[in-house]
Curated annotation (Swiss-Prot):
This is Sodium-coupled neutral amino acid transporter 7. The modification Phosphoserine is found at S28. It comes from Homo sapiens. Belongs to the amino acid/polyamine transporter 2 family. It is found in: Lysosome membrane; Cell projection, Axon. One of its GO terms (biological process) is asparagine transport. The keyword Manganese does not apply. It catalyses: L-asparagine(in) + Na(+)(in) = L-asparagine(out) + Na(+)(out); L-glutamine(in) + Na(+)(in) = L-glutamine(out) + Na(+)(out). The chain crosses the membrane at residues 56-76, 82-102, 130-150, 178-198, 205-225, 239-259, 282-302, 319-339, 371-391, 395-415, 428-448. GO terms for cellular component: axon; lysosomal membrane; membrane; neuronal cell body. It comes from the Eukaryota. Symporter that selectively cotransports sodium ions and amino acids, such as L-glutamine and L-asparagine from the lysosome into the cytoplasm and may participates in mTORC1 activation. The transport activity requires an acidic lysosomal lumen. It is a multi-pass membrane protein. Its main location: membrane.
């Protein structure tokens, strides 16, 4: 039997576990975040042995479904129609599931409980730092997308309340920049400053209800469309093979639950790779059904004229859609602080490690540093959200990073784990797994490079 030796030189990867804000980074919003001592004792936390198989499926589905749902009809349009969109998602699903299984295997081998800790342990210091930077940038970009979504939905709701026609200019207090800023300062900033997050369970509930309600509305509106809604051109084939790849960021952003998955795996009553394979397969099939239902019906309802945020394509006066907009706003208001908390914890760990200051010796300045980090993060995301026109442009950038979490880092972990096995004669399965790891890294690097370059030179500079 192969012996696995996972980079056990702890001096090389000095981990930051607590900077006054213990965070199991990017875990599912259903999980309470608490200091380490509370984490291990809390009955509501993700303690090892407390989560059933069915519960794990729910948590993974919840972590997967989110704001990216609104962009899926536009992704089908970008990909070139229903057939291309379905084929792309089905092909991606194999790699998405395998990446989740690889992370569970490496977590078990390295005895680490979070995504970035697994990467640190298996791949070493440099890759670990790159992973943490990627998580920080990804959460930062997602926070920008959340603020844009708030503005999109508020515009439609305010238009109905003020009884203004579509596109008409209203009073200054209905201006998009003012309403986003007011909402952010009144609700998001106060929720982002605290050291701990105790409202994650409510965010989880709102997220689940909002996601399923949006999907139901999109499907119902396709089956029984309003008379005034006429679809644009219904594409049946992609304009080019590059057009198909331009839909990749949305799919990667939508299905990226890999960073959240490692704590969930370690929380299971039976944290076994085989059991986990069944969990993630079931969860991804459920998520696929939701994304496909929204993507197909939203695209067929509006065709090529669909907005990057599908809810913007519906009339402002539609009350059923207005309820969906309200759900999305409430969900985003509670989800932003959670994503910010995760990004802040990563930045904190990187900063303390760079300074060479042990966490225990720097607790005294934690509050001042936390408030400063929160204000800088909040103001930068707000400023960018005010001037970026739609979520499609943000997703096109951070979707490339999501590809790294799905493909690149799991692929590197698989390669390093297999290379660490001490066997004189390598069996065929060893070569197959190493080759598959190389394929994952290559494919992920290509998607990241292509989508990021396209986002910069086509979307952002257009």
């Amino acid at each position: 039997m192969a012996q696995v030796s996972i980079n056990n030189d702890y001096s090389e990867w000095d981990l930051s576990t607590d900077a006054g804000e213990r965070a199991r980074l990017l875990q599912s919003p259903c999980v309470d975040t608490a200091p380490k001592s509370e984490w291990e004792a809390s009955p509501g936390g993700l303690d090892r042995g407390t989560t059933s198989t069915l519960g794990a499926i729910f948590i993974v589905v919840n972590a997967c479904l989110g704001a990216g749902l609104l962009n899926f009809p536009a992704a089908f349009s970008t990909a070139g129609g229903v057939a291309a969109g379905i084929a792309l998602q089905m092909g991606m699903l194999v790699f998405i599931i395998s990446g989740l299984v690889i992370l569970a295997y490496c977590s078990q081998a390295s005895n680490e409980r979070t995504y970035q800790e697994v990467v640190w342990a298996v791949c070493g210091k440099l890759t670990g730092v790159l992973c943490e930077v990627a998580i920080a940038v990804y959460t930062f970009g997602t926070c920008i997308a959340f603020l844009i979504i708030i503005g999109d939905q508020q515009d439609k709701i305010i238009a109905v309340m003020a009884k203004e026609p579509e596109g008409a200019s209203g009073p200054w207090y209905t201006d998009r920049k003012f309403t986003i800023s007011l909402t952010a300062f009144l609700f998001i900033l106060p929720l982002s400053i605290p050291r701990e997050i105790g409202f994650q369970k409510y965010a989880s509930f709102l997220s689940v209800v909002g996601t399923w309600y949006v999907t139901a509305i999109v499907i119902i509106k396709y089956i029984w469309p309003d008379k005034e809604m006429t679809p644009g051109n219904i594409l049946t084939r992609p304009a080019s093979w590059m057009a198909v790849f331009n839909a990749m960021p949305t799919i990667c952003f939508g299905f990226q639950c890999h960073v959240s998955s490692v704590p969930v795996f370690n929380s299971m009553q039976q944290p076994e790779v085989k059991t986990w394979g069944g969990v993630v397969t079931a969860a991804m099939v459920i998520a696929l059904a939701v994304y496909m239902g929204t993507g197909i019906c939203g695209f067929l309802t509006f065709g090529a004229a669909v907005d990057p945020d599908v809810l913007l394509s519906y009339p402002s006066e539609d009350m059923a859609v207005a309820v969906a907009r309200a759900f999305i706003i409430l969900s985003v208001l509670t989800s932003y602080p959670i994503l910010h908390f995760c990004g802040r914890a990563v930045v904190e760990g990187l900063w303390l490690r760079y300074q060479g200051v042990p966490v225990e010796e720097d607790v005294g300045r934690e509050r001042r540093r936390r408030v400063l980090q929160t204000l800088v993060w909040f103001l930068l995301t707000l400023l960018l959200a005010l001037f970026i026109p739609d979520i499609g442009k943000v997703i096109s950038v951070i979707g490339g990073l999501a590809a790294c979490f799905i493909f690149v880092f799991p692929g590197l972990c698989l390669i390093q784990a297999k290379l660490s096995e001490m066997e004189e004669v390598k069996p065929a399965s060893w070569w197959v797994l190493v080759s598959y790891g190389v394929l994952l890294v290559t494919l992920g690097a290509f998607i990241f490079g292509q989508t990021t370059a396209n986002a910069i030179f086509v979307d952002l500079l257009a």
